[in-house]
A protein has these predicted regions:
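Glycine-rich, acidic loop regions that bind phosphate or pyrophosphate groups
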Residues: 1-76, 254, 265
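Structural signal for hydrophobic packing residues in well-ordered secondary-structure cores
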Residues: 4, 10-13, 58-66, 81-85, ...
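Active-site diphosphate/adenylate-binding microenvironment
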Residues: 77-158
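Structural beta-sheet core signal
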Residues: 8, 32, 115, 167, ...
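Active-site glycine- and acidic-residue-rich loops that bind
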Residues: 12, 91-96, 173-176, 244
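Thiamine diphosphate
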Residues: 2, 24, 40-51, 55-59, ...
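Active-site beta-loop-alpha junctions enriched in small/polar residues
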Residues: 12, 118, 269
């Protein structure tokens, strides 16, 4: 990386963030800010460790920092964005394409997002555009499958009519807490759920492919479940889609019907979240899935 100095705020420098630690820390200095003094220098030695409130510390740091000319750096960032821009034009229904449609149709409007855990969570982080605080609800690396629907329900109760919550989940997570559609229906919460149905635990399958040479176990959900009928049994409107035009129409209808809970079930073929780096590798040393 190009950074001479890394200012880390509330970070524990876990291996998923740093990759190979010796390569990550080479030839750069760290300022580590955390409310908990025990986190400072635990995984990465800092040149300056500051324990306290982020807002107060950043104000003090800004007073000591001269204003620099970042024009050339912004040019470089935009060049990288163009070089590595995701190609959504694949001609079939994929999760990245669908989430790009969600982003395009909700940008600048009053929406919040809640995800479950798995591949869809990674794709949501990559392809949605979250631009306001407290509008992105995800359990990060904790791996709490089933989190998404209760989180969306609670957020919708908190936001009320001022903001609508879009919930992204996989078929695995819905099997864990899908019963909460009863509460959503009973309270009339206008949560929009998008269920990614790839008949498996996609993230587990991807990890078993990369780390265990495709020795798959306990990640296939091949017994077909009708998620539309399941959701409809609670009195919630649901639709099943398998093509781009079907998803676009379903999304348009669901966004227009803003007062009611709606569910879109996406049938998609198994694919991989990219880019991905193996544990212990440098964070730009990506797995080749071809």
């Amino acid at each position: 990386g190009a950074a001479d100095l890394v200012i880390a705020i509330g970070s524990r420098f876990a291996d998923r963030q740093t990759g190979n630690l010796s390569k990550y820390t080479a030839n750069r200095k760290f300022i580590h800010i955390d409310i908990d003094p025990a986190e400072i220098d635990k995984n990465v030695g800092s040149s300056l460790g500051l324990a306290g409130d982020m807002r107060t510390i950043l104000k003090l740091l800004m007073r000591q920092t001269p204003k620099g000319d970042l024009a050339a750096w912004w040019v470089q960032i935009r060049a990288w964005q163009e070089e590595y821009d995701y190609d959504y034009h694949v001609g079939r229904l994929t999760v990245p394409w669908a989430l790009h449609q969600v982003a395009q149709n909700t940008r600048g409007k009053a929406y919040a997002y809640a995800t479950d855990v798995g591949q869809h969570q990674m794709w949501a982080a990559l392809h949605l555009r979250v631009e306001e605080p407290r509008t992105w609800l995800t359990s990060g690396g904790l791996g709490t499958m089933g989190y998404g629907l209760p989180a969306a329900m609670g957020a919708q109760l908190a936001w009320g009519d001022s903001r609508r919550v879009i919930h992204i989940a996989g078929d695995g997570g819905i099997k864990m807490t899908g019963n909460e559609y009863y509460t959503i229906a009973r309270l009339g919460l206008p949560v929009l759920s998008i269920i990614v149905n790839n008949c498996g635990l996609g993230m587990i399958r991807q990890l078993q492919k990369v780390l265990y040479d495709e020795r798959y176990i306990a990640c296939e959900l091949d017994y077909e479940m009708d998620y539309v009928k399941y959701v409809e049994s609670f009195g919630i409107k649901a639709v099943r889609v398998g093509a781009q035009d079907e998803f676009a129409a379903a999304l348009k209808n669901a966004l227009e019907d803003a007062a009611q809970p709606r569910v879109i079930v996406m049938d998609v073929w198994r694919s991989f979240v990219e880019p991905m780096a193996k544990g212990g590798a440098r964070i730009d040393e990506f797995v080749d899935f071809k």
